[in-house]
Amino acid sequence: MNNQTLATQYEMDFSYNPLPFFSDIEDNLKFNKKLDLNLYCIKRPKQTCFIHITNPNMLAWGIESGDMLVVEKNDDLYSGDLVVLEENNEFHVYEFMAHSGNYLFMALDSTTQNINTKRLVKFTYYRHRDQYDSSNETSR
């Protein structure tokens, strides 16, 4: 086998192949449709962005350096939401808690201070998409 043939075989073995739908596996072994996860995972694409995590200090929350957060822009804020706030041209991730008129933004970064306030200023919040699913929507 020469190098040209070996390279062609390598491309065929390791080239991108989309995952088939379960129901299509038996019917069509040569699957040619692509599955776009954005259509299924992102409800509001114009209000959604991705934030690449470079901070290694959020391991206690299961967020590692190199992870990608799916973040949705939203005007509403609920206890338990993960929110992204910009401070000094850097993004920081907090968990929002509200109790008896006190509002706490608990930093997920172990080296960042929590923010405790009695008054919320009206601004747009960026909420980590994973915390917002339709099953919790009715309980809010």
Curated annotation (Swiss-Prot):
SUPFAM superfamilies: LexA/Signal peptidase. Pfam families: Peptidase_S24. One of its GO terms (biological process) is SOS response. Belongs to the peptidase S24 family. This is Uncharacterized protein HI_1546.
